[in-house]
Amino acid sequence: YCDGYEVLTSYRNSKNYGDNWISAGYALWFIRESRYLNNARMLMNTSCAVSGTGFFFSRKVIESAGGWTFHLLTEDSEFSVHQILKGQKIGFCAGAILYDEQPVTFRQSWRQRMRWARGCLQVFRKYGVGLLKGMGRGSFSCYDMSMTVLPAFVLTVGLIVTYLVVATVTAVDGIPFWPCLIYILRALFGMYQTLFIIGLFTTVTEWDNIYTSTGKKIWYTFTFPLFMITYIPISVAALFTKVKWKPIEHHRADRKVLETAAGRSGK
């Protein structure tokens, strides 16, 4: 705030990384987002983006917006896009760490990520024209946010359409299905490899910020791509499903994680 930022977001960490592959998948993605998206944006002197609830804004910001008027399914993304279109630059404070609690069941995860997927569509529907105009004026932040809220759907739908076309042509022409299946499996394996490299790099560089055992850090690096690949059916379902906001229950207060983090920061 003293550096002139009216909006700041934090380093989004998690207190239950080691619960299972689902909580670890969330946690690793958010750590990557903090270190390699928002921190990179700060180094480039462009706007960051709010993620989750660990953020700060001045009274001036909320008054200029007429109160908290952001009620789409992904209000954090909506708030970020709104501020960027108003010319506000969002900052990132790496020393302000939020210890979030992540879902641990696939049912909870499906419901939450379905909301996020649908919410991103809502944000682009409401602010897409403004973002495109900003891109036309040379705004990197508008381009950045467009790539943040839209690509998952574009890539997913494109992938599904491609597979359906290939499968249809195969069936009509009487071509054996096995080559098509091999193509699909190769594509999925390529996705797995890319996501594994992303997860591995983040795990290695942010090792001391991940609060679980060494074995779990290593194991959940291998399950991270599987967690991310489940976004494909979720994204497709979000296109055709009416999604409502439902709370995700939180019950934990992992004092051990917080005490360990406090001890490390005091070194």
Where does each model-flagged region fall?
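Hydrophobic, aromatic-rich transmembrane alpha-helices
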Residues: 157-173
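Long helical/loop segments within the catalytic core of UDP-sugar-dependent glycosyltransferases
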Residues: 1-72, 114, 121, 125
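Nucleotide-sugar-dependent glycosyltransferase catalytic core
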Residues: 101-118, 249-252
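Active-site-adjacent helix/loop segment of glycosyltransferases
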Residues: 110-149, 161
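Catalytic donor-sugar/metal-binding loop of nucleotide-sugar-dependent glycosyltransferases
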Residues: 45, 80-99
